[in-house]
Amino acid sequence: MGGPYTILTAAAVPERVAAGVSLHGANLVTDKPDSPHLLIPKLKASYYFGIATNDDQRQPDAKDKLREAFTAAHLPAKIEVYDGCQHGWCVSDGMVYNKVGAERAYDHEITLYKKVLV
């Protein structure tokens, strides 16, 4: 649920959002007319998406549709699948927490924020 809200928020107030991150986000790409990925042309933000292995297995085309949408909007976005990490891998007290994957994801997040917001 969090991943879609980063896009919805950035599309609602694009002048106030310069960077967004989605870690183990789901439902970023749907067949519905209100799919978050369809709002990407409204954004002015750089993005980082860390996708869990099992989320990628459920929607193997989602990452490609995200890349296509960001490319068409001329916006920078890095999109990666975290092999071996399951949905929720960044939640430190969660059942599928993966410390190595979480630290890598947080490093990408901090790098993006430093690049765009500082």
What do the predicted segments below correspond to?
Residues 1-118:
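N-terminal cap/leader regions of alpha/beta-hydrolase-fold enzymes
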